[in-house]
Regions:
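Extended catalytic-interface subdomain
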Residues: 178-180
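Mature, function-bearing regions of proteins
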Residues: 39, 43, 157-172
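Conserved catalytic core of two-metal-ion nucleotidyltransferases
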Residues: 126-162
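Residue-level recognition of well-ordered beta-strand positions that form the cores
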Residues: 21-23, 107-109, 137
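Active-site nucleotide-donor binding segment shared across nucleotidyl transfer reactions
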Residues: 70-104, 108-114, 123
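Helical scaffold of the NTase/Pol beta-like nucleotidyltransferase catalytic core
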Residues: 1-86, 124-132
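Broad gene-expression machinery/nucleic-acid interaction feature
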Residues: 17-19, 101, 105, 133-135
Length: 180
Protein backbone atom coordinates (compact mmCIF):
# COMPACT_ATOMS: atom_id res chain seq x y z
CA UNK A 1 0.00 0.00 0.00
CA UNK A 2 0.87 3.66 -0.36
CA UNK A 3 0.22 6.51 2.04
CA UNK A 4 -2.58 8.86 1.01
CA UNK A 5 -3.79 12.14 2.40
CA UNK A 6 -7.48 12.36 3.28
CA UNK A 7 -9.53 15.24 1.92
CA UNK A 8 -12.51 16.71 3.70
CA UNK A 9 -15.03 14.00 4.72
CA UNK A 10 -17.91 16.01 3.25
CA UNK A 11 -16.69 14.85 -0.14
CA UNK A 12 -17.05 11.16 0.79
CA UNK A 13 -19.82 9.08 -0.72
CA UNK A 14 -22.44 8.08 1.84
CA UNK A 15 -19.77 7.21 4.42
CA UNK A 16 -18.60 4.15 2.47
CA UNK A 17 -15.71 5.80 0.70
CA UNK A 18 -13.25 8.55 1.44
CA UNK A 19 -11.70 11.06 -0.94
CA UNK A 20 -7.93 10.90 -0.78
CA UNK A 21 -5.01 12.12 -2.77
CA UNK A 22 -1.34 11.52 -3.34
CA UNK A 23 1.10 14.19 -4.48
CA UNK A 24 3.83 13.03 -6.79
CA UNK A 25 7.38 14.19 -6.00
CA UNK A 26 8.92 17.04 -8.05
CA UNK A 27 10.90 14.72 -10.38
CA UNK A 28 7.55 13.14 -11.35
CA UNK A 29 5.83 16.46 -12.03
CA UNK A 30 4.32 17.29 -8.62
CA UNK A 31 0.91 16.16 -9.86
CA UNK A 32 -1.79 15.67 -7.25
CA UNK A 33 -3.74 12.54 -7.98
CA UNK A 34 -7.24 12.22 -6.50
CA UNK A 35 -8.35 8.78 -5.35
CA UNK A 36 -11.70 7.55 -4.02
CA UNK A 37 -11.03 4.74 -1.54
CA UNK A 38 -13.56 2.36 -0.02
CA UNK A 39 -13.25 2.49 3.78
CA UNK A 40 -12.88 -1.30 3.86
CA UNK A 41 -9.60 -0.95 1.93
CA UNK A 42 -8.07 1.50 4.44
CA UNK A 43 -5.39 -0.28 6.48
CA UNK A 44 -4.77 2.47 9.02
CA UNK A 45 -5.36 6.13 9.75
CA UNK A 46 -2.36 7.90 11.23
CA UNK A 47 -1.67 11.35 12.61
CA UNK A 48 1.09 13.36 10.93
CA UNK A 49 4.53 12.24 12.17
CA UNK A 50 6.32 14.29 14.84
CA UNK A 51 9.18 16.50 13.69
CA UNK A 52 11.72 14.58 15.79
CA UNK A 53 11.04 11.44 13.70
CA UNK A 54 11.39 13.28 10.37
CA UNK A 55 14.70 15.03 11.09
CA UNK A 56 16.66 12.19 9.50
CA UNK A 57 15.37 13.12 6.02
CA UNK A 58 15.52 16.91 6.43
CA UNK A 59 18.24 18.68 4.43
CA UNK A 60 21.51 19.30 6.24
CA UNK A 61 20.94 23.06 5.90
CA UNK A 62 17.75 22.70 8.01
CA UNK A 63 19.16 20.52 10.78
CA UNK A 64 20.45 23.18 13.22
CA UNK A 65 17.33 25.31 12.88
CA UNK A 66 14.89 22.41 13.33
CA UNK A 67 16.83 21.03 16.30
CA UNK A 68 16.78 24.51 17.87
CA UNK A 69 13.03 24.64 17.28
CA UNK A 70 12.53 21.30 19.03
CA UNK A 71 14.65 22.50 21.97
CA UNK A 72 12.63 25.73 22.17
CA UNK A 73 9.39 23.75 22.12
CA UNK A 74 10.62 21.56 24.97
CA UNK A 75 11.33 24.60 27.14
CA UNK A 76 8.10 26.35 26.09
CA UNK A 77 4.91 24.42 26.76
CA UNK A 78 6.21 21.11 25.44
CA UNK A 79 4.12 21.25 22.25
CA UNK A 80 5.74 19.04 19.66
CA UNK A 81 5.25 19.96 16.03
CA UNK A 82 3.80 17.42 13.65
CA UNK A 83 5.06 17.41 10.08
CA UNK A 84 2.93 17.66 6.94
CA UNK A 85 3.82 18.59 3.37
CA UNK A 86 6.99 17.69 1.50
CA UNK A 87 9.07 16.77 4.55
CA UNK A 88 6.39 14.34 5.74
CA UNK A 89 6.01 12.80 2.27
CA UNK A 90 9.78 12.37 1.95
CA UNK A 91 9.89 10.67 5.35
CA UNK A 92 6.87 8.46 4.60
CA UNK A 93 7.93 7.32 1.13
CA UNK A 94 11.71 7.73 0.91
CA UNK A 95 11.18 9.65 -2.36
CA UNK A 96 12.62 13.10 -3.06
CA UNK A 97 9.84 15.59 -2.27
CA UNK A 98 11.93 18.43 -0.84
CA UNK A 99 13.28 21.13 -3.13
CA UNK A 100 15.81 23.87 -2.48
CA UNK A 101 12.99 26.35 -1.78
CA UNK A 102 10.70 24.03 0.22
CA UNK A 103 9.10 25.23 3.44
CA UNK A 104 8.92 23.10 6.57
CA UNK A 105 5.17 22.54 6.96
CA UNK A 106 4.32 22.01 10.62
CA UNK A 107 1.18 21.66 12.74
CA UNK A 108 1.01 22.57 16.42
CA UNK A 109 -2.03 21.60 18.51
CA UNK A 110 -2.88 24.09 21.26
CA UNK A 111 -5.46 23.55 23.96
CA UNK A 112 -5.37 26.81 25.88
CA UNK A 113 -4.81 30.52 25.47
CA UNK A 114 -1.62 30.18 27.48
CA UNK A 115 -0.34 27.46 25.14
CA UNK A 116 -1.22 29.67 22.17
CA UNK A 117 0.70 32.59 23.66
CA UNK A 118 3.71 30.42 24.52
CA UNK A 119 3.71 28.91 21.03
CA UNK A 120 3.77 32.37 19.46
CA UNK A 121 6.74 33.30 21.68
CA UNK A 122 8.56 30.07 20.79
CA UNK A 123 8.00 30.59 17.06
CA UNK A 124 8.81 34.33 17.03
CA UNK A 125 12.54 33.84 16.27
CA UNK A 126 11.55 31.86 13.14
CA UNK A 127 9.27 34.58 11.74
CA UNK A 128 11.92 35.84 9.31
CA UNK A 129 14.17 32.80 9.01
CA UNK A 130 14.52 30.87 5.80
CA UNK A 131 16.60 27.90 6.93
CA UNK A 132 13.89 26.63 6.43
CA UNK A 133 10.94 28.98 6.29
CA UNK A 134 8.30 27.61 8.65
CA UNK A 135 4.76 27.26 7.35
CA UNK A 136 2.87 26.60 10.57
CA UNK A 137 -0.77 25.72 11.13
CA UNK A 138 -2.11 26.15 14.64
CA UNK A 139 -4.71 23.48 15.47
CA UNK A 140 -7.32 24.97 17.79
CA UNK A 141 -10.28 23.35 19.55
CA UNK A 142 -11.90 20.61 17.54
CA UNK A 143 -10.23 20.25 14.19
CA UNK A 144 -10.02 23.94 13.27
CA UNK A 145 -6.69 25.40 12.18
CA UNK A 146 -5.33 28.86 11.41
CA UNK A 147 -2.05 29.88 9.81
CA UNK A 148 0.47 31.05 12.41
CA UNK A 149 1.75 33.95 10.31
CA UNK A 150 -1.80 35.17 9.81
CA UNK A 151 -2.53 34.77 13.53
CA UNK A 152 0.67 36.62 14.41
CA UNK A 153 -0.28 39.54 12.13
CA UNK A 154 -3.33 40.11 14.34
CA UNK A 155 -6.20 40.73 11.91
CA UNK A 156 -9.74 40.79 13.34
CA UNK A 157 -10.84 38.04 10.93
CA UNK A 158 -8.91 34.86 10.11
CA UNK A 159 -9.19 32.09 7.53
CA UNK A 160 -10.06 28.92 9.44
CA UNK A 161 -9.72 25.44 7.95
CA UNK A 162 -11.46 22.34 9.26
CA UNK A 163 -12.67 18.99 8.00
CA UNK A 164 -16.04 20.66 7.39
CA UNK A 165 -14.61 23.35 5.11
CA UNK A 166 -12.99 26.77 5.08
CA UNK A 167 -14.48 29.90 6.64
CA UNK A 168 -13.66 33.35 7.93
CA UNK A 169 -13.95 33.65 11.70
CA UNK A 170 -13.57 36.51 14.14
CA UNK A 171 -10.37 36.33 16.13
CA UNK A 172 -12.24 37.13 19.36
CA UNK A 173 -14.63 34.20 18.75
CA UNK A 174 -11.71 31.86 18.14
CA UNK A 175 -10.14 32.96 21.42
CA UNK A 176 -13.44 32.38 23.23
CA UNK A 177 -13.41 28.79 21.97
CA UNK A 178 -9.90 28.18 23.30
CA UNK A 179 -9.80 27.30 27.00
CA UNK A 180 -8.48 30.06 29.23
Amino acid sequence: GRPLIVRRPGLAREGRAVCCGIPLPPPQGRLRIPVLVDWAAVRSVEAPPPLARCLEVAPESWQASLRALLAACATGDGAEPAVVGSLAWQWLTGLEYLREDSDADLVFAVGSRRALSVLDEVLAPWADRTDPRLDVEIRLAGDRSVAWREWRAGPPWLLVKSTAGVELAERTRLLEDVEA
